[in-house]
Amino acid sequence: MYLDAAKKQEIFEKYGKSNTDTGSAEAQIALFSYRISHLTEHLKLNRKDYSTERALTTLVGKRRALLNYLKNRDIERYRAIVKALGLRK
């Protein structure tokens, strides 16, 4: 599987406030970004997989909502996570 418990733990350790921090906006945004990149690669090979395309659109929307929340709450944390993940904004 592309996202096992060890990979999730690695993401949470890198972007969360602690190694058990799964709820912070940064940790969730990083997890969504990993899943989005995986689904994007899947869709390059399977162009007619519409259920995956819908799931990808949903994930992008969730990540966008979290980014907007973080931007409104703490602009410095927002800029840091965008830079760390290499997002366009």
Curated annotation (Swiss-Prot):
**Which SMART domains does the UniProt entry name for this protein?**
Ribosomal_S15
Q: Which domain of life is it from?
A: Bacteria
- GO molecular function, a single term: structural constituent of ribosome
The answer to whether the entry has keyword RNA-binding is yes
| Keywords in alphabetical order | Ribonucleoprotein, Ribosomal protein, RNA-binding, rRNA-binding
Its annotated function is as follows: One of the primary rRNA binding proteins, it binds directly to 16S rRNA where it helps nucleate assembly of the platform of the 30S subunit by binding and bridging several RNA helices of the 16S rRNA. Forms an intersubunit bridge (bridge B4) with the 23S rRNA of the 50S subunit in the ribosome.
Describe its assembly: Part of the 30S ribosomal subunit. Forms a bridge to the 50S subunit in the 70S ribosome, contacting the 23S rRNA.
Matching entries from PANTHER family are given as: RIBOSOMAL PROTEIN S15, BACTERIAL AND ORGANELLAR, SMALL RIBOSOMAL SUBUNIT PROTEIN US15M
Q: What is this protein called?
A: Small ribosomal subunit protein uS15
- This chain's source organism reads Phocaeicola vulgatus (strain ATCC 8482 / DSM 1447 / JCM 5826 / CCUG 4940 / NBRC 14291 / NCTC 11154) (Bacteroides vulgatus)
Lineage here is:
Bacteria, Pseudomonadati, Bacteroidota, Bacteroidia, Bacteroidales
**Gene name linked to the record:** rpsO
